[in-house]
């Protein structure tokens, strides 16, 4: 199998996934998954698509990710891995889609408006 490319995005994070046959090594920005993400919960979030199709130790994954924070990056990586797995084998698609791993979360931070403190919060109103 050749290398499969996929892209995942979430908020301002962009993850580029390079998936190939292997022993289950996952490296993010040339470091191991466990070193890159501090929390065990985030690591399990990244591995969810592989656990869903029971292929934890079948593919080597190299990931380049930039932008955002840990959570946004992890969700971008999860989407990218799910998309790459669908390219490898289209029969994975129904189970991944059912769990919602193929849905791009389109929510972004709302921009700050002038005359307001934040996106929607106004300055304190003084009647007199």
Swiss-Prot record:
Family: Belongs to the universal ribosomal protein uS9 family.
One term of GO molecular function: structural constituent of ribosome
One of the protein's GO biological processes: translation
Designated name of the protein: Small ribosomal subunit protein uS9
Alphabetic keyword roster: Ribonucleoprotein, Ribosomal protein
Gene3D superfamilies per UniProt: 3.30.230.10
Xref: HAMAP family: Ribosomal_uS9_B
Disulphide bonds in the chain: none
Gene Ontology CC entries for this record: cytosolic small ribosomal subunit
